[in-house]
Amino acid sequence: DKSGTTAEDTAATVTMSATDIESDALTYSIVATPDNGSLGSVSGATVVYTPSTNYNGFDTFTYKVTDANNGVSNIATVTMTVTAVNDVPTTDNGSVTTAEDTAVNVTLNASDVDGDALTYAVGTATNGTVTVSGNTATYTPNAHFNGTDSFTFTASDGTLTSDSSTITVTVTAVNDIPVANDITVTTVEDTEVTITLSATDVEDSTFTFAAVELPDNGTLGTVGSTVVYTPNQHYNGSDTFTYTATDSNSGVSTEATVSITVTAVNDVPTTDNGSVTT
């Protein structure tokens, strides 16, 4: 019988042996192949044993010897000890989809044939931020970004670190509502004023404006990108109205306020005709 040792995933050349008192030429042949590996062709008294991928533990095979006079030996056993080797973890690419301005979690997939506990590390993204907790990464797109982004990650068993894999993130567009701007204007009593309405939108520059709450102390003309405010006759003081902006994708802003100051004007006194009899 023989014994040998090799490391996991490493082939070993085994030299079989036998004795013959007549010193005949001997021919070696395999009787039973190993359960957890494979054998190459027998060459003289040697054979190459290759353990199965990632296997470690004990394995055996048997052989016999035939001499020049066709005498056959007993069956001998070769016991192989395959020592464990720490295997590098492996990781898988992945993909995830989220809406604009919305964070998304993605599970990082990795495996280790040794069953070791794994820790994960993530790289940076061009158009967002990435954090990791356990095997879960959280991707947060930059404000108003939409399109394709990606980041890489690795897994470590505490000794060996995997190659990088890539998570591809698709960020779908969401219509951002416009922001109507508050406005302050001044006019004088009994004098109309033209007011330019305005709004901002990260995606759009064309808006439709609509008045919501009308002024208490004046009137508005037709609302477009501008509107004419006419104070009531002889009114002076403060007045307000509100409006909204709608973008080309039908997104409607919250209400904005136009604050109007109507300054007083000294009015000419008026007199009345009269008559008298004496």
Model regions and ranges:
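Low-complexity "stalk/linker" and mucin-like segments enriched in Ser/Thr/Pro/Ala/Gly
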Residues: 30-45, 121-135, 211-225
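C-terminal edge beta-strand
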Residues: 3, 70-85, 95, 160-174, ...
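Short strand-edge motifs at loop-to-beta-strand transitions and within beta-strands
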Residues: 45-49, 135-139, 193, 225-229
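Conserved structural position at the C-terminal beta-strand
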Residues: 65-67, 155, 245-247
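Extracellular ectodomain surface segments
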Residues: 1-33, 52, 87-125, 142, ...
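Surface-exposed, short loops/turns at beta-strand junctions within beta-sandwich domains
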Residues: 53-57, 143-147, 233-237
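A structural signal for beta-strand boundary/capping segments at domain termini and interdomain linkers
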Residues: 25, 58, 71-75, 117, ...
